[in-house]
């Protein structure tokens, strides 16, 4: 139990024969991990999802748990986050990708074959509608507004103090 002044790196060490090297993550050396494969998020769509232990669990300076408890909870957090993510992606990634593919195919089809032809048709018809609307405005609405304006402009009020 003590005051920590530096951010500690977490590493999980296991024997090579008991654990596969390709399924473990070395959190202390992120540069090696990032360069090991192709970038799966080149446009940084999920850069806000990088949640660390310190972002979730934080102890104020005045109250600290035992160092061993802090280290074990940190390791358990990282391992559970890693294992649960792998488990969920194993069962959900393919069905979700399939559903997203179907959804985007439907949206693309609707956009290409229904929405854009409708928009183009409206844009072709709009000049005719604009001409008709201008005629209705000039024939009906403009004289009506002019008459009402002249009627109200002839009204005068005089106030007297009695």
UniProtKB/Swiss-Prot annotation:
GO cellular component: acrosomal membrane; caveola; caveolar macromolecular signaling complex; focal adhesion; Golgi membrane; nucleus; perinuclear region of cytoplasm; plasma membrane raft
Lineage top rank: taxon: Eukaryota
This protein's UniProt keywords: Cell membrane, Cytoplasm, Golgi apparatus, Membrane, Nucleus, Phosphoprotein
Subcellular location: Nucleus; Cytoplasm; Golgi apparatus membrane; Cell membrane
Chain ranges on the Cytoplasmic side, renumbered to this chain: 1-86, 108-162
Post-translational modifications: Phosphorylated on serine and tyrosine residues. CAV1 promotes phosphorylation on Ser-23 which then targets the complex to the plasma membrane, lipid rafts and caveolae. Phosphorylation on Ser-36 appears to modulate mitosis in endothelial cells. Phosphorylation on both Tyr-19 and Tyr-27 is required for insulin-induced 'Ser-727' phosphorylation of STAT3 and its activation. Phosphorylation on Tyr-19 is required for insulin-induced phosphorylation of MAPK1 and DNA binding of STAT3. Tyrosine phosphorylation is induced by both EGF and insulin (By. similarity).
Main location: nucleus
Phosphoserine modification, residue list: 20, 23, 36
PROSITE patterns: CAVEOLIN (PS01210)
Parts of the chain in the membrane but not crossing it: 87-107
Single GO molecular function: protein-macromolecule adaptor activity
Residues with Phosphotyrosine modification: 19, 27
GO terms (BP aspect): basement membrane organization; caveola assembly; endoplasmic reticulum organization; endothelial cell proliferation; insulin receptor signaling pathway; mitochondrion organization; negative regulation of endothelial cell proliferation; negative regulation of skeletal muscle cell proliferation
Topological category with respect to the lipid bilayer: Peripheral membrane protein
Complexes and interactors: Monomer or homodimer. Interacts with CAV1; the interaction forms a stable heterooligomeric complex that is required for targeting to lipid rafts and for caveolae formation. Tyrosine phosphorylated forms do not form heterooligomers with the Tyr-19-phosphorylated form existing as a monomer or dimer, and the Tyr-27-form as a monomer only. Interacts (tyrosine phosphorylated form) with the SH2 domain-containing proteins, RASA1, NCK1 and SRC. Interacts (tyrosine phosphorylated form) with INSR, the interaction (Tyr-27-phosphorylated form) is increased on insulin stimulation.
Family statement: Belongs to the caveolin family.
UniProt name for this protein: Caveolin-2
Organism: Mustela putorius furo
GN (gene name): CAV2
